[in-house]
Curated annotation (Swiss-Prot):
EC number annotated for this UniProt entry: 3.4.14.11
Family, similarity comment: Belongs to the peptidase S15 family.
Catalytic activity: Hydrolyzes Xaa-Pro-|- bonds to release unblocked, N-terminal dipeptides from substrates including Ala-Pro-|-p-nitroanilide and (sequentially) Tyr-Pro-|-Phe-Pro-|-Gly-Pro-|-Ile
Role according to the record: Removes N-terminal dipeptides sequentially from polypeptides having unsubstituted N-termini provided that the penultimate residue is proline.
A molecular function (GO) term: aminopeptidase activity
Protein source organism: Streptococcus pyogenes serotype M18 (strain MGAS8232)
Protein name: Xaa-Pro dipeptidyl-peptidase
Subunit structure: Homodimer.
Length: 760
């Protein structure tokens, strides 16, 4: 374990003493440091009628227990404080450590003993994470140190778990959206699942916009998947034009219906544990699946601003700008009298994507988004540089396949009976519009590109993204983060994992940082919390997070690739082609080991190479035919210890998100030896070699200069490392699988790897 503590708010002595007193700690500025520490420790054992017993189970020195120490005349020292602090946080002498000083250095322990600062040390200790993954104060509250009185209690600028999660209100409302996406002449209704604590105070809201939450249709999804085996189409030379079109909602009328009290209820919905954490701290949770999902009406428009509007309508309802009904019969309306109108959206992948889309509308009431692994351009999710390009792990998927997965109205047999014919018509229109034949950018994709509206974002923004996420690739967050207005508060956590959540990792206090931010933005708490704009997980060692100023630098280093002419054959033998098509993981293993069709260049680094931004391959290339696709991957190659990309559980169910509520496991990325690590990758249709809007012809056997931008990253390579460059054609995970007889030739003497270099 290593501390990377970004959430602690430095506090004055007076404020620290006041907050400790509010928690019931009987400390006195006039008492000695030793007396105050003893009083603090005894309060921790509030379950015991006699605190001597648990105090005797701690040691103050290697040869003295804590009870004996406090009964002695010995003075409090750094050695004693450190040893007791470690034990209070759950670290066991002789098991987790033998030498406390060395262990504290390894932990990067954030508290440095000064006898005159004991009150501040105790305050800081309570806000510091235990071995279990919870802060000490959260651990104490989870054990019942504070009663669940359904009111706010704060410590170090963060809300504590004092809302009763055993008496939650669970209700359903149906919000009227200014849409008619299925063109039935009726405004679409959006189902909203609400979970909120009982409270006399207006509550802020965490909203998870999740098209998955009302169910998914995996059978329809699998039937809709596309075969990847097809020839690369030769496209006609042309220029692509698109236009920015404002989304115009339909008109709605003020509602004059009576207020209804008898709301639909529910017992369970698959929740997001970060939401649960905040539910126990006085934040209502709502789950919204949007148009075309079970319980709602309309068509699943998948990614456009009509879908975004269906979520926006819910924020409007929370702020009395839209109508909600008690049921589909629309006999009574319902108001969000319990809400303070301020909203933060949460969720990963599609969920985070909807958060980004919502933010670009500038809707009033949306105070903050926490968007994890989020898409900012749907074209860049399903296409790349003029190619159909499947997201990592999902060959054959496209946006209409995702529509089939998430159009959960068809999971309700009655809805299927009444509406499936119309749904199939609209789905066919969507399949035609996305143009899987050419892979080109068009108006359909432009209408699903949130980057063009990034300037309208006015809420606070928090992004998290994995630099090993080949599903929602790093370009998605790179482009939106760098497009955000300079006038807003923005934050980015870049981790070394894949497509995963990070709120329950041991090495980073993400949960507590979000608590401090949300108390600022949604509760108006003046806590003076300041979070760095960008925090990056160091790839060279375990559990080390660093502040970074920018994602993408203008300083570059050009690396020569060699002097040879290298031939890349596109064609595979029939058996090999079929085998790779059945198992793209076997293809990846062969590719990285230099066995698949490729041109391979290994570069032994003579100095450190700190990459920050978008690597570009500038290549001199020619094709034997009038077509060609180019794929590239950059590897950190050779056996050494690296971070894995999938977090593993360190302890099971050790994190309590409330008071015995919604427990989850503590996780972390493992650090272990492996043979290589993908740093970046990229794909291009050579007919789009100049830009996305220009379709060029490819002259047979004529040299072309190609600039292939790879996925942005921040990655530190050290002197002596091997940088492996792999150039090839068909990628069996991502691209169409064209097995025709053509070859690419690369002139390495006229080619370079252009690397953005991080400054010191």
């Amino acid at each position: 374990m290593r501390y990377n503590q970004f959430s602690y708010i430095p506090t004055s002595l007076e404020r620290a003493a006041e907050e400790l007193k509010e928690l019931g700690f009987d400390l006195d500025l006039q008492k000695t440091a030793k007396a105050n520490l003893e009083s603090f420790l005894r309060k921790l054992f509030f379950h015991y009628p006699d605190s001597d017993y648990p105090l005797s189970h701690l040691i103050a020195k290697n040869d003295m227990d804590a009870l004996s120490f406090f009964q002695s005349e010995q003075e409090l020292s750094k050695e004693v404080f450190d040893l007791l602090a470690l034990q209070v946080l759950g670290f066991i002498p002789g098991v987790d450590f033998t030498e406390a000083d060395a262990f504290l250095d390894k932990l990067a322990f954030p508290i440095h003993f000064d006898e005159t600062e004991i009150i501040k040390h105790i305050h800081h200790l309570l806000a510091t994470r235990c071995k279990s993954g919870m802060t000490l104060i959260d651990d104490l509250v989870s054990q019942g140190m504070l009663t669940m009185d359904n009111d706010y209690h704060f410590f170090n600028g963060k809300s504590l778990a004092t809302f009763d999660t055993s008496q939650l209100i669970r209700e359903v409302v149906y919000v009227e959206a200014p849409l008619d996406t299925d063109q039935d002449g009726q405004l679409d209704l959006i189902k909203v699942n609400i979970i909120r604590p009982q409270s006399q105070k207006p509550l802020p809201t965490l909203m998870t916009p999740s098209p998955y939450h009302q169910g998914i249709n995996e059978v329809a999804n699998d039937k809709k998947l596309y075969r990847m085996e097809k020839e690369l189409v030769v496209k006609k030379r042309r220029q692509i034009t698109v236009e920015d079109r404002d989304f115009i909602p339909l008109e709605t009328q003020p509602c004059k219906l009576p207020i209804g009290q008898n709301l639909e209820s529910f017992s369970y919905i698959n929740s997001y544990s970060l939401n649960d954490y905040f539910l126990a701290r006085g934040f209502a949770n709502i789950y919204v699946s949007g148009v075309g999902t079970a319980g709602s009406t309309g068509f699943m428009t998948s990614g456009d601003y009509a879908q975004i509007e269906s979520f926006k309508a819910v924020i409007d309802w929370l702020n009395r700008r839209a109508t909600a009904y008690t049921s589909h019969s629309k006999t009574h309306q319902v108001r969000a009298d319990w809400a303070n109108g301020l909203v933060c959206t949460t969720g990963k992948s599609y969920l985070g994507t909807m958060s980004t889309g919502l933010a670009t509308t500038g809707v009033d009431g949306l105070a903050m988004i926490i968007a994890e692994s989020a898409i900012s351009s749907w074209y860049n999710y399903y296409r790349e540089n003029g190619l159909v390009c499947s997201p990592g792990g999902y060959p054959g998927e496209d946006l209409d396949v995702l529509t089939e997965l998430t159009y959960s109205r068809n999971l309700l047999a009655g809805d299927y009976l009444r509406h499936n014919d119309r749904y199939q018509e609209l789905l066919n229109q969507q399949s035609q519009a996305l143009d899987r034949q050419s892979g080109d950018y068009n108006q359909f994709w432009h209408d699903r590109n949130y980057l063009k509206n990034a300037h309208q974002i006015k809420c606070d923004v928090v992004y998290t993204h994995g630099l090993q996420d080949w599903n929602v690739k790093p370009r998605q967050v790179y482009e939106i983060f760098n497009a955000l207005p300079s006038t807003i508060n923005k934050h980015l956590f870049l981790h070394q994992g894949e497509h995963v959540y990070m709120h329950n990792w041991q090495s980073i206090d993400f949960r507590e940082s979000m608590n401090a931010l949300l108390c600022q933005k949604l509760l108006g708490l003046a806590n003076d919390f300041s979070l760095p704009e960008m925090i990056w997980q160091d790839n060279t060692c375990p559990q080390n997070w660093q502040e970074r100023k920018v994602f993408g630098t203008s300083t570059i280093k050009e690396l020569d690739l060699g002097q040879e002419l290298l031939l890349i054959d596109n064609h595979y033998g029939e058996d090999e082609f079929k085998a790779y098509g059945k198992d793209f993981r076997a293809f990846k293993a062969a590719l990285f080991e230099g066995k698949a069709n490729q041109a391979l260049v290994d570069i032994l680094l003579e100095e450190d190479l700190p990459i920050n931004g978008e690597i570009v391959l500038q290549l001199k290339v020619k094709s034997s035919e009038n077509k060609g696709l180019l794929s590239a991957q950059i590897l950190d190659y050779g056996k050494k210890k690296r971070l894995g990309d999938l977090p593993i559980a360190l302890t099971q169910s050790s994190i309590d998100n409330g008071q015995n509520f919604s427990r989850e496991s503590l996780k972390e990325l493992p650090f272990r030896e492996d043979s290589y690590r993908v740093i970046s990758k990229g794909f291009m249709n050579l007919q789009n070699r100049n830009n996305l809007s220009s379709i060029e012809t490819i002259p047979n056997n004529k040299w072309m200069t190609v600039r292939l931008p790879l996925q942005p990253t921040i990655y530190h390579l050290e002197k002596g490392d091997t940088l492996r460059v792999i150039l090839y054609t068909t990628d069996f995970e991502h691209t169409v699988r064209d097995n025709s007889n053509y070859a690419l030739t690369i002139d390495l003497s006229q080619s370079q790897l252009i690397v953005p270099i991080a400054s010191n």
